[in-house]
């Protein structure tokens, strides 16, 4: 998908209005507990400032439900951003209105202003055209660098593009399109996809789209038990979507018909309850005990999956292998994370999409050892499903 980017436009002396994703966690003392999303936007921000642009940033934060709520003010973000840039960041009182317009017009080359939370106005999520038009009037160039909200047609992502002369992608979105797009359109092979998580229902569209692209699919997480039950195996008390058994069978048949190597676990870690103090042991999937719950993939499966990952040239991972939030049930997920890091160092392209997988990579301190970690949970999932993302479709080709 070829879209014009920040590199294609002249920004010197221009008011550049950029949609970013500054939806960061903030504690009760107004401290930002994780500034990853702010840091990720810095390349685009610095490009505009250093190029003499007059930067106006906009974002949402939390869910203020269309009303002004001081708890969701972006002021702490302006403060943190000014520390990271070592330059003042003006905090606007609102995101539209005369006062904001005057402040935007008063900006000098290389100066930065952050607008107040877009979602203080219900019109943002409703994609109200008047609101979009008013936002658009603040800038001369629009840049979207918020991949995490690209799957939403909101005023600041989609509506605004109808009222600006220039609408381009920032570096963060460009990077997402390069990695996710290349993996789906023109991957180096073998291409292995690893899908985890608890429900098949959340991954049907991803599976069906990937069946047209990949060579091998490795399945983990609780969704394996729906596949096993569909094959007539005993799954004890493991999580199963009983209304998706036919679908599971259909997916297995579809993979076989398309010549996809779809692998399921050979062994699983089981426990009587999902709790940190529960004792656990490994069982073969064809002889699971009654009353037990599958909580992770077992050692044989880890080895089997690791070998597939290390033989791949492109690896895409979405979803954990087990209940990785509990340390005793996290081994499979961390083993996959380590295998991805190993594959990367051997020259494979490795892509991680989805919040849980990214969290596992971070917890294993391997974030720097992966080619690309997607910044958008829902957006990357919809992209992998082959769906058009309104916030990106709307940008200039």
Swiss-Prot record:
Substrate binds at residues 21-23, 37, 60-63, 119, 152. Gene3D superfamilies: Phosphoglycerate kinase, N-terminal domain. PROSITE patterns: PGLYCERATE_KINASE (PS00111). Its EC number is 2.7.2.3. ATP binds at residues 203, 294, 325, 354-357. GO terms for cellular component: cytosol. InterPro entries: Phosphoglycerate_kinase, Phosphoglycerate_kinase_CS, Phosphoglycerate_kinase_N, Phosphoglycerate_kinase_sf. This is Phosphoglycerate kinase. It holds the Pfam family PGK. Monomer. SUPFAM superfamilies: Phosphoglycerate kinase. It is an enzyme of class 2 (transferase). Belongs to the phosphoglycerate kinase family. It is found in: Cytoplasm. Pathway: Carbohydrate degradation; glycolysis; pyruvate from D-glyceraldehyde 3-phosphate: step 2/5. One of its GO terms (molecular function) is ADP binding. Keywords: ATP-binding, Cytoplasm, Glycolysis, Kinase, Nucleotide-binding, Transferase. It comes from the Bacteria. The keyword ATP-binding applies. It comes from Chlorobium phaeobacteroides (strain DSM 266 / SMG 266 / 2430). It catalyses: (2R)-3-phosphoglycerate + ATP = (2R)-3-phospho-glyceroyl phosphate + ADP. GO terms for biological process: gluconeogenesis; glycolytic process.
């Amino acid at each position: 998908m070829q879209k014009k980017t920040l590199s294609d436009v002249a920004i010197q002396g221009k008011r550049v209005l950029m949609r970013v994703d500054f939806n960061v966690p903030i504690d009760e003392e107004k401290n930002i507990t994780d500034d990853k999303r702010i840091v990720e936007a810095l390349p685009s921000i610095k490009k505009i400032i250093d190029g003499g642009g007059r930067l106006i940033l906009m974002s949402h934060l939390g869910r203020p439900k269309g009303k002004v709520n001081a708890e969701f003010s972006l002021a702490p973000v302006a403060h943190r951003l000014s520390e990271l840039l070592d330059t003042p960041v003006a905090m606007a009182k609102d995101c539209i209105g005369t006062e904001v317009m005057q402040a935007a017009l008063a900006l000098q080359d290389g100066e930065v202003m952050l607008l107040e939370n877009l979602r203080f106005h219900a019109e943002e999520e409703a994609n109200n055209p008047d609101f979009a038009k008013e936002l658009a009037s603040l800038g001369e160039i629009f840049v979207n660098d918020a991949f995490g909200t690209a799957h939403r047609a909101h005023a600041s992502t989609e509506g605004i593009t109808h009222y600006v002369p220039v609408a381009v992608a920032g570096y963060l979105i460009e990077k997402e399109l390069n990695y996710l797009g290349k993996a789906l359109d023109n991957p180096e092979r073998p291409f292995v996809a690893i899908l985890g998580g608890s429900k098949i229902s959340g991954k049907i569209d991803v599976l069906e789209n990937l069946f047209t692209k990949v060579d091998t699919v490795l399945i983990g997480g609780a969704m394996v038990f729906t596949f096993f039950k569909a094959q007539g195996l005993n799954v004890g008390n493991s999580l199963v979507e009983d209304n998706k058994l036919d679908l599971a069978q259909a997916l297995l048949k579809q993979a076989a018909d398309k010549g996809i190597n779809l692998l399921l676990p050979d062994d699983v870690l089981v426990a009587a309850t999902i709790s940190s103090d529960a004792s656990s042991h490994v069982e073969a999937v064809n002889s699971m005990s009654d009353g037990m719950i599958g909580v992770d993939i077992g050692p044989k499966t880890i080895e089997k999956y690791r070998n597939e990952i290390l033989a791949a040239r492109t690896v895409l991972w979405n979803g954990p292998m087990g209940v990785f939030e509990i340390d005793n049930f996290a081994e499979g997920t961390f083993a996959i994370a380590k295998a991805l890091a190993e594959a990367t160092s051997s020259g494979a392209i490795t892509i991680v999409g989805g919040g849980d997988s990214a969290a596992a990579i971070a917890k294993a301190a391997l974030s720097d050892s992966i080619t690309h970690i997607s910044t958008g949970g829902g957006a990357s999932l919809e992209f992998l499903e082959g769906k058009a993302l309104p916030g990106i479709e709307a940008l200039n080709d």
